[in-house]
Amino acid sequence: MERVCFLARVRPDRLDEYRARHKDVWPGMLAALRAAGWGNYSIFLADDGLLVGYLETDDYEAALAAMAATDVNKRWQAEMAEFFVAGGSPDESFLRIAEIFHLD
């Protein structure tokens, strides 16, 4: 099982709307994430816009590819792009960070 953590930056003027959108994630998007192997997935957002994501999956590259192949993910990413500081698709611009310690 891969444990994946990633960082991104949400625009400060869009924090409230970004939070609101994630209180009501589309059912089709949730189903696609599960079907693609995304488990124990969490997103954390600091007041300065720092976003930290965490998920567990058997194969991260395969899980990314499976999501990239879905229409619902393409629509979701297109809508979410405007919330992020960096341009481009949010799911392609995340900075994955290395795990250096784990305690079970």
In which residue ranges do the predicted regions lie?
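Short amphipathic alpha-helical segments
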Residues: R14-G39
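Basic/polar N-terminal segments that are highly enriched at the extreme N-terminus
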Residues: M1-R3, H102-D104
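Eukaryote-biased recognition of C-terminal alpha-helical segments
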Residues: L95-H102
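Short, glycine- and small/hydrophobic-rich beta-strand elements in well-ordered beta-sheets
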Residues: L30-V52, E56-D58
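An amphipathic, aromatic/His-enriched active-site/gating alpha helix that lines ligand/cofactor pockets
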Residues: A36, T57-F94
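Active-site-flanking beta-strand signature of metal-NTP-handling nucleotidyl enzymes
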Residues: V4-R9
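Short acidic, gly/pro-rich beta-turn/loop elements at beta-sheet edges
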Residues: D16-Y18, G53, A63-A65
